[in-house]
Structures are given as structure tokens and as C-alpha cells.
């Protein structure tokens, strides 16, 4: 077996499959594009779903890739096992309706065992297969595999909801008896026992059925096109080929671990407790790549995942004695390891470091809050005489504050408390079940549509015309091809068309189809791309249509021009964002409608009003500069030399279309555009908002809609000016400010009067001191305007030694407000209010020194006050 670096393994994989006629698919962005079913790209096949479900036909049905991926369903196991990772690299080879089982197995065996390639020893390889899949068994035998090395496994059948499915065969490497201390042998494979002896290095999925959850597996229908989908983890291959005990001792992780050694002063011991080193090395890889691909830490979705990873890594850094910000210092090492295939980490190093460091600094403050929460929980346990920290509280520390369970356990045990591990596991399982349920709901590969995939007739979109005559090539009605249709809805393909099919954020054209008499025979309501790329017109049929007949196709010209104004303005906006807030502000999505444009982009904070003003001004300057818009068809490399921006997630063919707006903007774009920027007329931003972690959205209008927006603002300003009696519009702001200042002064004066009144009233309330169980207390009903006044009472009470406990009740409107304050450790205000609040049909809680509650039964106030003596 050859000893290869990870870069050599990756390249040899790609070279082998290229020699078998495969094209190399570049690694896609970790953030899925146009796929709401995925939080992250989580496998090599995830980016190829459109090919497997038949919605798009690839130029070459043989594909290979090395795809960066993220999976986060087992974060807590990262660092504990030899093979769990959040970010990993999946090597794959795929056949879309081309070769199948025989070639997949034979070529796979050749790659693994040939001296020209990986040169694995054959006697170290074992294969599992689905028991009913005798063809795979026989093919392995034909390759020279001993029957004793073939293990039937009932679970070797791949399916995730509706869509492509089929048996799979897995390949394992036997690391020998040193990794099998109990000498269990092949039972480890046959009974799926977790072990470090047999390492799964490759899975070959034989996708031959359309899975249907409504029927038994035996009734699944054969796919129109059988497919091959395989995946081999680079990290595992590297561990085996480099003789590493775990994935972490390979050249993918050790350089990071060496840097952590320098930062911590600790030494990594492969045979010792090295979990913290592994967690840090794994998580900084995921963070570096995900942030480089446009995801940013946040409180939801993928942003929450990144925040959780970063906080877990920071806490493990503290366990190694690293108390200052340090993760950002590891980003260059990650970039250097992966540079040969993924140069983007080093290219975006400054931005990634900035985000990681800022998040570390924020978490340093959060740790203090989390420590305070834990201290409060432990104090409450002491007050209640309990000795165990509940699982739900441990989970909250873990989930909300990023505290690893080990740290909570350590701090709690130091304070003399036990840990409710089972309760924590239960809370964790509930979260995982919710996550898995979400995958089941949205993780299907999608059903293949044989009718659409079978359209092979050529069709060409004509950019520079609004109307043309063309022959009708295909009619599909009720999901079947037909020669004619006279009513209902149908899908049509023409030899050529002026109708733009929805793509790249630009909506489809609408319009009409006329016969040779000039009568409208169909209304075009939508246009989408067919699997083979033809514009597929969805029409409402008004009169007879037949294949082979010529028709006149007319688009709605006014609508197209309005859409083009917004699309061209989107290109200007994209360039302006780069200039004003930074080149990291790349497109994350767009929509160019008739009435408005919507542009989503990566950015880590709200765009300030001043920045929005600059962006809006810059776009309008380019409109007024009357820049000529040109389009050029060329190859991708030439386009990039021209400075064209290629968008994440977009797949470009051999010939691409470059849209250039003067010297200001150059982008790869297949959409339609104006001839000159001046045709936009006017550009106005109407909204800027966050739509998720690290993603902002700008909504803007152009032309007539922009003018209407300005006029509406002016009308509103005139109304405000009239209300505040400003002599001119320019004086309105000063008038409003003066009124605001006056209101603030009055509110301040009112608050001071309330405070004086409360202080005066407090003198009477605080005189009535009672005693029970050795505790001095005051219990009184007070007449106040709001709950804030109760806190003012409590603040005044704290200033002097009136009593040990204060209980105040106020009927405010239809609600009863209760406050309990305590100066003594013998009375926990939060616990006391939990006993008192139900008397007035309420509930509440709080800290040991202060608690509040709300109720609804004012008739029981006297009963509550009488109960205070029993509850202190």
C-alpha cells in the first residue's frame, strides 16, 4: 500500500476517474444554493441532486468530485472517537444513467488494489452487501475477492424518503488484531459492533429504484436511468494509508494540533487524554471553511451551528490553559494544509480571522454570564437542600451558553453537587429527534420525471427579440406527450423562443401565442428549464395547438423591460456593495421581479444608514453616467481574466455570457439586460434587513416605482410638517426634535415626582414591621401606577435596615402584581413568590434577593398578605 499525503490521495482519486471518462465537478460551496432541504452540503452527492432526480441532464453522465462537507448531528462525539468530524471531505464517483454495478465494482477494486494506484493489500479488504443483491456478491468474486471477505448486511439498502434508492456495498480495511483486543473478528462487521479494527473507507450505492414510502420495498419501481453514487472519506483513507492510529494523526490535522501545542504549552499524546486538541483541530477547520463560504455565527440555523462549534472549541482551549483569544490564529494553518485544492481559505484569511476573533471576544463575555447562571443554579440547589444539578439545567448551559458537559460537571462536583446525566441525555435526544425529523421531511432526493427527461428536441432562446415565429416541437398534457391539445394547461417546447425561462434570479417572461390568423391560442404563464435545458412554456390553452405547426410567440414587452431595469440595477448594487462594505458582501440570492428587486448578500452586521446612503448614491451615479451595457460569449477562463464575478453555486458550461456595464461591473450572467444604464432611470433602496445568520437583504425599486417611493416619502414628510407646524419641509426635523426634547423633559419630571411620591409613601409602608420564625418582614398592599414603582419601593427599602423581607402587592388595572425582596440567606425570594403567587391566580419567580409575579384575582390580596408569615 502506498503511503500518500492527503493531497496526493485526492489527486490520485480524481486522476483515476478522469482516466475512466469522468469529468471533475469542482467542490461546491458549503452553503446550499437553491436547496432549502439542506442546512449544509453534507455529502458528495448533495450537489448533484438535480442530476439524480432527472430535473437536469449533465453534459457528461460520468462525474467525479472531492466535496467539502459538514455534518453536525454528532457534534458531541467529535474528539471522543477516532473518526467523527464536523467538516470532512468526501471523494466520489457518479454515473447518471451510464455505467452501473459491474463497472462500479470492478473500477473501484482496480483503484484500491492496482500497483499503479493505491495498491491496497487485497487480503486486508472486506466488503459488505445487501443479502438480496447477489449480483454485487458475484461481481466481487469475479474481481478475485475471497467469499470469506464478503459479509451480508440487511441494512445495506440506501434510501432517504421518496426518490432514488437501492442496495449498497461497503468496503472496509482490516487494521488487524491489535485493534481487536477481544479477538471478535468478523462479528464486528456482521453485527455492526462499534470498533477500530474494520474501517469503512468507501460506500458504493447502486441507485436503481424510485423509493415510495407508501409501498413495500419489493414494490419499488425501477428508475428510468440507473445511477451510481459513491463516497469515500478522505480523512479515513489518509489515516489508513499514512498508518495513523486515528484520523487526527494525519497530515490533515496534525499541523493544527502542533500549533495548539505551542499556544497551550501542553503536549498532544495520541494514547492519552487528547480530546481538547481534537475538538479544536476539527472545529477550526469547519469554521474556517464555512465562514469562507459565506456563513457567519449567529443565533439560528447554520449560524447557530457555527457559534456552537466556536464556543465548544474555546471552552476546550480553556481546558488546555488557553484563556485568551486563540482560534483565529489557527486559520492560516488550516489554509496552508488545504491550499492545493481549496485556496479560498488563504484568499479570505483576513475576513475569516476577523469574524472568528470577534466571536471569541463576544463569547468571553458570554462565559461570564454562563458562569453566573451556573452559580445561581448551585445557590438555588443549596437553598432547596438538593444535591443534584438537573439535566434540563445542564442542557441549557450546554445549548445556550456553550458550556461542555464536562466543564459543568467539573465545576458542580468541585462545589459538592452531582450531575443528572440521564436528564441531560434525554434533553439532548429531544433536540436530535427534532433535527432528524426535519431531515426526513425535507431530505428526499426527489422523484425522477421520465416524461420531462425524455425531451431531446432542440430549442433556442433568442435574446434580442420580443416576438418571433417558431415551430411547436413538443406538447405535454397530463404528464404525457401528445400531438395536439385544445384546452386546459399544457407544457410546450418550440424550436426557438423569445420567452426567457426563469433562472439566475430573473423571473420568467409571460405573454401570448398566436396562430397564423393572429388569434391568441394560448397564454404563457410561466417558463422553466426542462431537464435537457430547453425552455418549457407553461400555457393556458385557449384554442387548438398541434405539433409541427408554426406559431407567433410574443412576450409582454413592458413587463420584460421593467424586469430588465431591476436586473441591471442588481448588478450595479452588487458592485456598489463591494465598494462600500467590502468584497465579502457576495450574492447569496436574488429576485428580479417586475415591481422590485431583492438582493441577498453575506455580511455580519446591519448595513448602517450612512452606508445605505453611499450605496444608493453610487448606483444612481452609474445610472446617470449612461454606461453602455455589452454582452460577450466566451469561455470561463477568459471571462475571469476580464474580471467577471462568478457567483457561488452557479454551474457554468463551456460557453458563458459576460455582462459588462461600462467599466463599473462585470459579471457572468445568463439573464436579459438593458442596453444602457440610463434606461433604469432611478434607483431607491426601500428596505434593508437580516434574513438569517450572516445574511442581509436589500429590497429596492427602479424607474417609475422609485419615483413613486420618493413621492410617497415626500407626502408623508409634508403631513408631518403640517402636524408639527413647520413653516417649510426642511424645518420639520428640527421641529420634531424640539417636541421630542420637550417630551423627554416632561417624562423626566414626571418620573422624579413619582419617585418622591413613592419615597413619601414608603415611609408609611416601612413602619409596619412584623416578625415570624425569627424573620422580620413587611407585607403591604400599595397603590401604584405600574410594576416599576414596586421596584422603586424595593430600592428604597434596601437603603436602610427596615426588615429582612419585603412583600408588596398592587392591583394595577385587572392585574395583580407581587414583589418579594430578601436581604437574608434564610429566605429565597424566588421560592417564596412561587408559594404566594398562586393565591392570586398567578405565577412568577426570580433570584434569591428579588422576585416578581403576576396574578389575576385581586379579591385574594388580603389572603396573600396573611400567608406571608407562614412562608418566610
From Swiss-Prot:
InterPro entries: aa-tRNA-synth_II/BPL/LPL, Ala-tRNA-lgiase_IIc, Ala-tRNA-ligase_IIc_anticod-bd, Ala-tRNA-synth_IIc_core, Ala-tRNA-synth_IIc_N, Ala-tRNA_ligase, Ala_tRNA_ligase_euk/bac, DHHA1_dom. Its cofactor is Zn(2+). Its EC number is 6.1.1.7. CDD domains: AlaRS_core. Belongs to the class-II aminoacyl-tRNA synthetase family. Catalyzes the attachment of alanine to tRNA(Ala) in a two-step reaction: alanine is first activated by ATP to form Ala-AMP and then transferred to the acceptor end of tRNA(Ala). Also edits incorrectly charged Ser-tRNA(Ala) and Gly-tRNA(Ala) via its editing domain. This is Alanine--tRNA ligase. It comes from Streptococcus pyogenes serotype M28 (strain MGAS6180). The lineage of its organism: Bacteria, Bacillati, Bacillota, Bacilli, Lactobacillales. The gene is alaS.
